[in-house]
Amino acid sequence: MSQEDVLAGLGEIIQEVAGIPAESVKLEKSFLDDLDVDSLTMVEVVMLCEEKFGVSIPDSEVKNLNTVADAVNYITSHQ
């Protein structure tokens, strides 16, 4: 799956759980500062990403996913 596909899928997930329009989800955006995705919402985002993309994202890695690019890179490198 390409980075663009993962970004689009992640945008859909964030729109679903946080109400942020998918087109606003860009690589440079910070989950907390730009998209207002707090730690509780992030747990839901991670669970849905694991289901959608077939990856496992351990709790120890979640704290390193600060931006959309961090998440996209993690997902694409672990598929």
Task: Tell me what each language-model feature is.
Residues 68-76:
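Short, cationic-aromatic polyanion-contact patches
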